[in-house]
A protein has these predicted regions:
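Cytosolic regulatory regions of ion transport systems
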Residues: 1-446
């Protein structure tokens, strides 16, 4: 499938890498030759140096027979115009654009994006997606992440096996046998600096961070068995009132789950805007690195401190200060992925990388109707994907024993006729099964 990616930054590069592994015919356009050199040296894709919104550049990239256009340059306007030209001149079927500026995304202008105006088929807003990701964590105490799957019948959760985890040393199979009534399946583990896909004989240890799929109705019981009985946080402090902070505050304000929330914003004009547009959130104008400000918002009583300014260093330091002052859990926005592996060792509980979230949402849109959800994990370690099994899939009408799947793929669950199945070696896959699976990054998903 011929695909043009406009923008060779971290997001564009990662998408090109993923799609080229799945036999997409990818061309990457960028104005920066250094970025393109990195792409061409490492990936099996074509590169074009030029301005993506110029018709001649798109034509040179193969737009006349292109099926998917992905615009992820640093400019919203370039992304929007590129999609317009891709539609008007080249009749490209699917156009996906990353748009950051929230003014373009207001409900007042929702009719802007259609074939008569800006023909963009899917808009990805990193700020809104990050806010949703943080909110999921707030309403899922005991987890480090949570994603709803299979029409909310299942959840993908990440959790840490704390010192009060009573089943340390048991294998995945032994845990399943010990709790046969729980519809849950462990898929992969982070252990220190190691990340690996599990099999039935993998033993679970204290301090492991595990990711599993679990039936929504069993979630509380499963969390309890892993040593988590945390209550819903009653208070949160947000540091940073930019687009992400504002979007998160709105989600909290409109939620049925009550969380008393304080928001700290350094810019006076922005703080006044936030205060006038948020009804139930207390806004304080000040520096999130100022201990006096942290005391003023009673950080010591907070279940969560959420540091989401545009500055990684400010986010890290404010999280550490908040933890030292008594905040229970820190959530920290990190744009530089080089920091992520270091932070858990110095007291930062959870990190959010906007690039990973953006990449997941774009891949979900690219892969088409058979993909329901796509969630990237662990700084490029792999993806959890929810997909409908197609008749041509190599999974269809075979069981796991026959398939001999590669080591880095783990099937988590099947939903068939609204019934949840945790698969074993004899489970046969059927057409239209809703399957959740994990695949490490280096594995091609083209036949799934």
């Amino acid at each position: 499938m011929k695909t043009i990616i406009c923008g060779a930054g971290d997001v564009g590069y990662s998408i090109a890498d993923k799609l080229s592994r799945e036999n997409f015919e990818v061309t990457v356009i960028d104005e920066d030759e250094n970025r393109l050199n990195k792409v061409s040296e490492n990936l099996d894709v074509k590169t074009i140096n030029g301005i993506p919104s110029m018709p001649s550049v798109l034509e040179n990239a193969g737009a006349n027979d292109c099926e998917i256009l992905i615009a992820v340059t640093k400019s919203d306007e370039t992304n929007m115009v590129t999609c317009q030209i891709g539609h008007s001149l080249f009749k490209i079927k699917k156009k996906i654009a990353r748009i950051r500026q929230q003014d373009y995304l207001k409900n007042d202008w929702k009719n802007l994006y259609n074939d008569e105006n800006f023909p963009i088929d899917a808009i990805i807003s990193p700020e809104q997606e990050v806010a949703k990701g943080i909110f999921r964590r707030l309403i899922s105490p005991g987890t480090i992440d949570m994603v709803e799957l299979s029409d909310k019948k299942l959840k993908l959760i990440g959790l840490k096996c704390e010192d009060n985890f009573l089943h340390s040393g048991l294998s995945v199979r032994e845990l399943s046998e010990k709790f046969p009534d729980y519809l849950a399946n462990i898929m992969f583990i982070f252990r220190g600096d190691q990340k690996f896909t599990v099999n039935s004989s993998t033993k679970i240890e204290k301090k492991d961070t595990i990711f599993l799929v679990v039936e929504t109705d069993n979630l509380t019981d499963v969390l309890s068995e892993f040593g988590h009985q945390e209550l819903q946080a009653k208070k949160a402090v947000i540091i940073g009132g930019g687009n992400i902070g504002f979007s998160l505050a709105q989600l909290i304000e409109n939620s049925e789950t009550y969380i008393k929330t304080e928001l700290i914003e350094a810019n006076k004009e922005r703080a006044e805007f936030l205060a006038s547009n948020l009804e139930n959130i207390t806004v304080t104008c000040g520096d999130g690195l100022d201990n006096q400000i942290l005391e003023e918002v009673n950080i010591s009583d907070s279940g969560y401190c959420i540091s989401i300014t545009e500055d990684d260093e400010v986010n890290i330091l404010s999280s550490l200060l908040a933890k030292r002052a008594g905040a229970n859990t820190s959530i920290t926005l990190i744009n530089n992925s080089n920091y992520s592996s270091l932070l858990s060792n110095i007291g930062v509980d959870m990190t959010i990388d906007p690039k990973i979230i953006t990449i997941s949402k774009i891949l979900e849109k690219v892969r088409g109707v058979k993909i329901r959800n796509d969630y990237s994990i662990g700084e490029g370690f792999g993806e959890v994907i929810e997909a409908d099994i197609q008749s041509e899939s190599f999974l269809c009408n075979k069981n796991l024993k026959e398939l001999e799947l590669p080591k880095g793929i783990r099937i988590g669950s099947i939903v068939r006729d609204k019934k949840i199945i945790i698969p074993n070696s004899q489970t046969v896959f059927k057409e239209n099964d809703d399957v959740v699976f994990f695949a490490e990054t280096n594995l091609s998903l083209i036949h799934i």
